[in-house]
UniProtKB/Swiss-Prot annotation:
SMART domains: Ribosomal_S10 (SM01403)
Gene this chain is encoded by: rpsJ
Name recorded for this polypeptide: Small ribosomal subunit protein uS10
InterPro entries: Ribosomal_uS10, Ribosomal_uS10_CS, Ribosomal_uS10_dom, Ribosomal_uS10_dom_sf
GO cellular component annotations of the record: ribonucleoprotein complex; ribosome
Family named by the database record: Belongs to the universal ribosomal protein uS10 family.
Source organism of this protein record: Desulfatibacillum aliphaticivorans
Sample GO molecular function, one term: structural constituent of ribosome
Length: 103
C-alpha cells in the first residue's frame, strides 16, 4: 500500500527513560512487521527555566530557579506495509509520551 512513502514519528516527553522505552516499543513493532526503521534519533532537549522570588514580600536578590526539560526523539519508518500501520495503531504507549505522526 505505502511502498514509496515513509512514516515520520516524533516523540516528546519529560522523562527520558519513558521516552526511550516507547521508542524501543515502536522500533520493535515496526521491525516485526517487516519495515525498515531509522532511529531513534535524539533531537535537542528543550530546557525551559523559570525564575521565581523565594520570599513573598521582600528580598529581590534571593531567587530560585526551576527548569522543565523536554526530551525528543525522531523515528523514520521506511517502506511501511499495511500490517505495520495496523500494528502501530494498536500499539499502546505510556501516558507521558506525546506522539506526532506524519505520513
Amino acid at each position: 500500500m505505502l511502498m514509496n512513502d515513509k512514516i515520520r514519528i516524533r516523540l516528546k516527553a519529560y522523562d527520558h527513560k519513558l521516552l526511550d522505552q516507547s521508542a524501543a516499543d515502536i522500533v520493535d513493532t515496526a521491525r516485526r512487521t517487516g519495515a525498515k526503521v531509522v532511529g531513534p534519533i535524539p533531537l535537542p532537549t528543550r530546557i525551559n527555566k523559570y525564575c521565581v522570588l523565594r520570599s513573598p514580600h521582600v528580598d529581590k536578590k534571593s531567587r530560585e530557579q526551576f527548569e522543565v526539560r523536554t526530551h525528543k526523539r525522531l523515528l523514520d519508518i521506511l517502506e511501511p506495509t499495511q500490517q505495520t500501520v495496523d500494528a502501530l495503531m494498536k500499539l499502546d504507549l505510556s501516558p507521558g509520551v506525546d506522539v506526532e505522526i506524519k505520513v
